[in-house]
Amino acid sequence: MSITYTTVGELKVGSYVVIDGEPCRVVEVTKAKTGKHGSAKANVVAIGVFSGAKKTLMAPVDQQVEVPIIEKHIGQIIADMDDKIQVMDLETYETFEIEKPTEDELASKIRPNAELEYWEIMGRRKIVRVK
């Protein structure tokens, strides 16, 4: 798995974090003041990149969390199968299958020979944009 580490206090809206083993995009960060006993706490609300599920993380601001490394690639659609798409990476010429996106905006643009941008996060791939 390709991950790095950072503290909860350094997370910003729009950054990525691993919660419950799934990479998530941070949509809200709130920090509570330090109390008489203990350290400041942060409440992080994030949405899963692959599942779209809302996840929360409540932790001290100095706690270490995993941050996924996102590798961005360009590929070309070779074949459109029922629920998957066969894609060839335009840098390495590797051929693989990737799940068809559920968003209507992306699904309507999928056709053979179209170029697309996909992200590889923690060994999984997701189509982000179809050109």
Swiss-Prot record:
Listed InterPro entries:
IF5A-like, IF5A-like_N, NA-bd_OB-fold, Rib_uL2_dom2, Trans_elong_IF5A_hypusine_site, Transl_elong_IF5A_arc, Transl_elong_IF5A_C, Translation_prot_SH3-like_sf
Sequence positions bearing Hypusine: 36
Query: Could you tell me which Gene3D superfamilies the record lists for this protein?
Result: 2.30.30.30, Nucleic acid-binding proteins
Q: Which UniProt keyword terms apply here?
A: Cytoplasm, Hypusine, Initiation factor, Protein biosynthesis
Q: What is its main location?
A: cytoplasm
Biological-process GO terms, alphabetical = positive regulation of translational elongation; positive regulation of translational termination
Statement: the UniProt record of this protein carries the keyword Cell division: no
Provide the protein's localization. Cytoplasm
A GO CC annotation given for this chain? cytoplasm
According to the UniProt entry, its GO molecular function terms are: ribosome binding; RNA binding; translation elongation factor activity; translation initiation factor activity
Tell me, in a sentence or two, what this protein's role is: Functions by promoting the formation of the first peptide bond.
Q: What is this protein called?
A: Translation initiation factor 5A
Give the species: Saccharolobus islandicus (strain L.S.2.15 / Lassen #1) (Sulfolobus islandicus)
Q: Supply the gene name.
A: eIF5A
